[in-house]
Amino acid sequence: IEMHLHRIEGLAEEYLYFNDDMFPVGHCVQTDFFRDGKGVIGMYRHLLSPNMYKKICRISDQVGRRLAGKRSALTFMRPQHICSPMLKSVCTQVYDSNVPEIRQTAECRSRTEKNLCQYVYLDYMYHKGLIIPEKISNRHFSVALASADRLKDFLKNPDTKLVCINDVKL
């Protein structure tokens, strides 16, 4: 689903993709996420891809690099795990490039380590200079580790703009 949001009729050119574990909790303004026609999000370089999530991130970066006309690299970029600032026209351009990995992901009934994710759009944007690599104000909580009281205290008095409440250890 996340790979197809840009196809929603009437969707704005600049839109935010929120995964089901991301929530705005503080005052946010458009410039937190978009400036001068570019998305704003932290981007991090990784070398190893030991799990399915990181393997998907690696493939998404490889496709984004290739479409941006960049050489492959030993490392890969992973966007900050927070809402994603998307540019509809760029997502459409990448999606319409008809690369095999996009078709294979669309045809797959369940996620595998050979799939892409919506990060392919952010990776392409990054490699084309359409990302301002700046960390978005956020906090992460894992329900596997954080106490209910700690989470409640944060939600009553947040010190960041966004929060990720995840069901896995981050």
Locations of regions flagged by a protein language model:
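Active-site-proximal specificity loops/subdomain of glycosyltransferases
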Residues: 1-12
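Conserved glycosyltransferase catalytic-site signature
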Residues: 1-2, 22, 114-119
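Residues that form generic nucleotide/phosphate-binding pockets
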Residues: 4, 66, 93-94, 124, ...
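Generic recognition of flexible, low-complexity loop/linker segments
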Residues: 4-5, 106-110, 150-152
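Short beta-strand-to-loop acidic/aromatic patch adjacent to the donor-nucleotide binding site
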Residues: 12-25
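Short catalytic/ligand-binding loop motif for oxyanion handling, primarily in non-cytosolic enzymes
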Residues: 23-27, 32-35, 118, 170
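Long, charge-rich alpha-helical interaction segments
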Residues: 34-115
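Long, low-complexity C-terminal extensions of enzymes
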Residues: 112, 117-170
